[in-house]
Amino acid sequence: MAKGDPKKPKGKMSAYAFFVQTCREEHKKKNPEVPVNFAEFSKKCSERWKTMSSKEKAKFDEMAKADKVRYDREMKDYGPAKGGKKKKDPNAPKRPPSGFFLFCSEFRPKIKSTNPGISIGDVAKKLGEMWNNLSDGEKQPYNNKAAKLKEKYEKDVADYKSKGKFDGAKGAATKAARKKVEEEDEEEEEDEEEEDEDDDDE
């Protein structure tokens, strides 16, 4: 079950799997010399399982629950070691938003103010409909801003990686913090420019 990684925890077993395992052990004790015909054996196990009461199955259900706890615990211990490189660094540059996300950030407060008590799901639905109804030209300012932020993000990542190698995490954290402030200032300036453009359109 742990193909390619011997340290990976053994998969969790179902109640039926424990039942089959028990049947196999019983068969070995009673007929140690007789090899198991798996096709026939599986069929018999399946038929027997179907005729068992919930009370009879309870023992195997408990075994499956205990094995699930074991599996979850082992996977929790195994996960960080395997995915350690993928662990999020709080000092890393923040991933840039998409054009749609920028549009949502602008119009979400407006929808909430005009529709008091509206659910989060309905807000998302309305935003999706509004975005889909925009022409490519109307989407352009948001997509352009997203492209700029993406470009900046890629530069920040390159700086962050090089800083992390030479100056350590502390230097990277300082750099990331400074970049974040600059990015927020830039966003505010662009927001003001867009609002001015909107006013001109009106």
Curated annotation (Swiss-Prot):
The protein's location, in the record's own words, is:
Nucleus; Chromosome; Cytoplasm
Give the protein name, as stated in the record.
High mobility group protein B3
- Residue ranges the UniProt entry marks as DNA-binding: 9-79, 93-161
The gene name on file is HMGB3
Q: What does this gene product do? A: Multifunctional protein with various roles in different cellular compartments. May act in a redox sensitive manner. Associates with chromatin and binds DNA with a preference for non-canonical DNA structures such as single-stranded DNA. Can bend DNA and enhance DNA flexibility by looping thus providing a mechanism to promote activities on various gene promoters. Binds to the delta-1 crystallin/ASL1 enhancer. Proposed to be involved in the innate immune response to nucleic acids by acting as a cytoplasmic promiscuous immunogenic DNA/RNA sensor.
Q: Where is the signal peptide?
A: none
User: Bias regions of kind Acidic residues — which residues?
Assistant: 183-202
Q: Where is this region: Disordered?
A: 71-98, 161-202
Question: Lineage of the source organism?
Answer: Eukaryota, Metazoa, Chordata, Craniata, Vertebrata
GO molecular function, one example?
four-way junction DNA binding
PROSITE patterns, alphabetized: HMG_BOX_1, HMG_BOX_2
Q: Organism, per UniProt?
A: Gallus gallus (Chicken)
- Please give the CDD domains that the UniProt record associates with this protein: HMG-box_HMGB_rpt1, HMG-box_HMGB_rpt2
